[in-house]
Amino acid sequence: MADHIAAYGSYLEQEKHASANTVSSYLRDLNQFRSWLLENGAADLRRIKTDTINEYLRYLERRGKSPATVTRSAASLKSFYGYMQASGVMKANPAKAVVTHRAERKYPEILTNKEVELFLEQPRCVDEKGFRDHAMLELLYATGIRVSELIGLNVTDVNLTAGFIRCSSRGKERIIPLYHGAVKALQDYIRDIRPRIIAAETETALFVNMNGERMSRQGFWKIIKHYQETAGIEKDITPHTLRHSFAAHLLENGADLRAIQEMLGHADISSTQIYTHVIQKQLKDIYNKAHPRA
């Protein structure tokens, strides 16, 4: 049973070019399902029927899991069993007929322009850490790249003369422009700071931790949370918040949806269209608060 799950994980990485977060999420859902099966005396993933999956989803609901979690678990099982069917391991997909309650759409958290300015001002350029953090945050908001893409950047991916970065992810490459402030922050960091903190001359990573090695997701998460606290911003800021804000602010200022899709690296335009709904919701909230008859 574990072998099938491991093979599916490899398929997601190598064939579907899924992100590390997506793979981790799907495998976590599948392993939780596997544990539940073992606890209930079912040991073979290949002998599962639709009724079994429905019972598992009801079990998640009884445990107080949110509709979004239950829906995601169902999606993970549908994807896994679709893979099992396509691989010839199973004749049919038992999860295909599963129907879940539609989860209430949760829109991404967006920072206002003032909140972004306040957040980007937090790193103090008085030492190596301050210069590095300033460059990272400016780059993140300038490009809207994912945190996995940020920490995966190499020095050779940056062209400051032309003012862009080259971002390779999920088997595709895209070119994203930089505004002047981000170029300046990167120039200062690459020229004056990075050479002093890298552990070895052979280090290729653009951003390194204070031990001189490539920055980790966990390390960057701590940096984000630290500056949220010092800025006194009440909204929950995650590494993805600046990505969401980047897209929403571009759209708000008239950018073409297809251009935003290209910069974000979305395979499907529907993923980008969520920001249209975010802007509409914000306008409606403003209207309801300000209009005397609303």
Cite the ranges covered by each PLM segment.
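Conserved catalytic core of the tyrosine transesterase superfamily
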Residues: M1-A294
